[in-house]
A protein has these predicted regions:
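Glycosyltransferase-associated regions of secretory-pathway enzymes
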Residues: 1-67, 85-192
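Small-residue hinge/turn detector
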Residues: 69-78
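Active-site acidic Asp-centered loop
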Residues: 78, 83-85
Length: 192
């Protein structure tokens, strides 16, 4: 199953920190192919509606939200593991991340000021290509951007997951089934 990373300008044009993070992912990917998605190659992997491409080109959709659309399209079509380009892997990526219908970073629920309450992250999402969550997210993004010219919230990806979790019992079950993992992923936040 593939690993997906996106840096629209190409890794060679990314800041050194991003280059080191991507290098760490490649080093720890085991036998999983690592696909770097860029502005120049995304169409080799997914076909997007023309209205989304136009909104990106006109500046109505920023890079982060365009990346969100790419993320759910890639996972819906191929499955695998999406890792943001700013994730640094200090060890081998565990094989069990690829073995379940759905995977995300998850820890003890808390009121951390975000809607996910540590039950999922959008910077690390994985699963099978037929995962209902990715299908619903893709369809939502397509419909939303067909009718809107701006994102209502920078983190509305999380809002959509929460609505899907509340409305579709199967999605809630997928999220609940993920074991706590990567419990030290936010430790640097506490230092700064």
């Amino acid at each position: 199953k593939p690993i997906w990373i996106c840096w629209l300008d190409g890794i060679e044009n990314a800041p050194l920190l991003v280059q080191k993070c991507v290098s760490s992912i490649k080093k720890n990917a085991a036998n999983h192919p690592v696909n770097i998605i860029t502005q120049d190659n995304y169409a080799e992997f997914v076909t997007l509606p023309e209205y989304i491409i136009e909104k990106k080109e006109k500046g109505l959709m920023g890079a982060a939200h365009f990346s969100d659309v790419l993320r759910v399209c890639l996972l819906a079509q191929y499955g695998g593991l999406w890792l943001d380009a700013t994730i640094y892997c200090k060890g081998k990526i565990p094989e069990d991340y690829f073995e379940n219908d759905f995977f995300t970073c998850k820890s003890e629920p808390s009121d951390v000021g975000c809607i996910s309450r540590n039950q999922w992250t959008t910077f690390c999402l994985g699963g099978t290509k037929d995962c209902i969550l990715f299908q619903i997210l893709r369809n939502f993004f397509f419909e939303y951007w067909k009718n809107e010219d701006f994102a209502i919230d920078y983190l509305f990806f999380d809002d959509i997951i929460e609505v899907a979790r509340e409305c579709v019992p199967e999605i809630n079950h997928l999220i609940e089934a993920v074991s706590y993992n990567n419990l030290e992923r936010d430790c640097l936040i506490q230092r700064f």
